[in-house]
Design a protein with these regions (language model features):
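Short aromatic-enriched loop/helix-cap "lid" or pocket-rim segments at secondary-structure transitions
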Residues: 7-13, 166, 230-233
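Secretory-pathway luminal glycosyltransferase catalytic domains
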Residues: 2-147
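Donor-binding and catalytic core of enzymes assembling or modifying cell-surface/extracellular glycoconjugates
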Residues: 142-229
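Leloir-type glycosyltransferase catalytic cores
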Residues: 226-245
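Surface-exposed beta-strand edges and their flanking turn/coil or helix-capping segments
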Residues: 81, 128-130, 167, 211-213, ...
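Short, low-complexity, polar/charged sequence segments that are solvent-exposed and flexible
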Residues: 20, 87-89, 132-137, 171-175, ...
Length: 245
């Protein structure tokens, strides 16, 4: 992200598709980039520990080309570029900005709260797994204690599971239909809510981070990865003011 923030550091687009590797084990990505490195002189920089901030970006030679392997999921990478990033993430399509749901959330008389339930691909990932129900139950209770008149907007890629399994008595609305190329609309809607309960997902992470409410309450899971060893630096994923359960 910090490389994107400065034009002179921008990484050239890689002319190959990685779509076929989606939902595969992480080691497949590793092998793939290792093979490419054998045939190219570009340096491969690997994130050794997920989410741990690496200071190497201040030392790289911007005249050279690099391949970065990892999630680089740490807000410390773009400190000082927050406004630039928010501008880049702001949709320019008025039909999206002024959509019925967006207008409803912005003008709501309630304290709007987004909740993201990420399942689907997480069920077979092996690297990341769905957050347990207790997390959401406890997070909702915290919101009720901190926020008056909350109204919850539910975002999920498994609405049937939510309706059948999450027996929670809260005022809510299920948001569906924004998939594939329109999935970004859900991030926009999350960001327009006053508060956020996120999953262990960069999708809802960005929705909460882009939320510009200065008094927002954001609740995130402590456990981010399926393997406990990978959670060693998971605390660095979220800003310090967010609540981790």
């Amino acid at each position: 992200p910090i490389l994107e923030a400065k034009p002179q550091w921008r990484i050239p687009f890689l002319p190959f598709s990685v779509r076929q590797y989606r939902d595969k084990k992480l080691y497949i990505h590793y092998i793939y980039y290792k093979l490419r490195r054998k045939f190219q002189s570009n340096k491969l920089i690997t994130e050794r520990y997920p989410s741990k901030y690496l200071k190497l970006f201040n030392k790289i030679d911007i005249k050279k080309k690099y391949y970065f392997l990892g999630f680089w999921q740490n807000p410390a990478y773009f400190i000082g570029y927050e406004d630039k990033i928010r501008d880049l993430f702001s949709p320019k399509d008025k039909n999206v900005i002024c959509s019925k749901e967006s207008t409803e959330i912005i003008n709501s008389q309630y304290e709007t709260v987004s909740i993201h339930f990420r399942r689907g691909d997480y069920l077979t990932s092996g690297f990341i797994e769905p957050v347990e129900k207790d997390f959401y139950i406890n997070a909702i209770e915290i919101i009720k204690q901190k926020v008056k008149n909350p109204f919850f907007y539910i975002f999920t890629n498994d609405p049937e599971w939510f309706e059948n399994e999450m027996k929670i008595d809260i005022p809510h609305k299920l948001i569906t239909g924004n998939v594939d190329k329109n999935a970004y609309i859900d991030i926009l809607l999350m960001s327009k809510c006053k508060h956020n309960i996120i999953a262990n997902s960069t999708f809802s992470w960005w929705g909460a981070w882009l939320n510009e409410n200065p008094d927002k309450c954001v609740i995130a899971p402590k456990k981010w990865y399926a393997d406990e060893k990978r959670n060693k630096f998971a605390s660095e994923i979220t800003p310090k003011e967010w609540i981790r359960l």
